[in-house]
């Protein structure tokens, strides 16, 4: 495990992953948040193929990302995102009602949408004649389509952490291919066109590409 000075804000990810998940590993959410908020950070890495005790001391499930911020450490991308959001009004409004709405939508992305979309995807990998979760996912996407038909952003007519996490949950092409949701598609495209997303995405791809070179050397 790479070590870092304790005062640095550090996003921890794997040292390498196969091609498939690149661009979707969830440290991207934290890189993106830092880029949006203008927060200085570094990226540390832990072994993908040897998830030892030191890693599990920081992330009990042996996953990524986790975040260290001085003497504070957090795991789970949602918890880390909320911690970063408290550092910037760009991500988290300070007015109480808007803050509450942002928190609600962040958790909706993780609990009401991603909790359905990820199991739906895993079931689909086995190519069943009919995915039993598809109706559930379509119902959630229909709710979002109605919301996003009425407004451009989830909270306060501007980008917040709620949009960051919702767009990241929705952007995988296998989710976007499930049906015709034009307002949602426009929303994802608009958010993923932001320079902060482009940089975070490119940086993650570059991180794993450099690891390929090391493995091949």
Regions found by a protein language model. Give the residues of each.
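GST-like fold's C-terminal all-alpha helical module
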Residues: 4-7, 106-195, 200
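GST-like domain detector, emphasizing the conserved glutathione-binding G-site
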Residues: 1-132, 145
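Short, solvent-exposed turn/loop segments enriched in Gly/Ser/Thr/Pro and often Arg
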Residues: 47, 161, 204-205
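Terminal-tail/helix-coil boundary detector
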Residues: 202-217
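Residue-level detector of family-conserved "landmark" positions at structurally sensitive sites
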Residues: 44, 77, 183, 201-202
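Residue-level signature of transmembrane alpha-helix interfaces in integral membrane proteins
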Residues: 54, 179, 184, 210-212
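Generic domain-boundary/flexible-linker signal
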Residues: 20-22, 175, 202
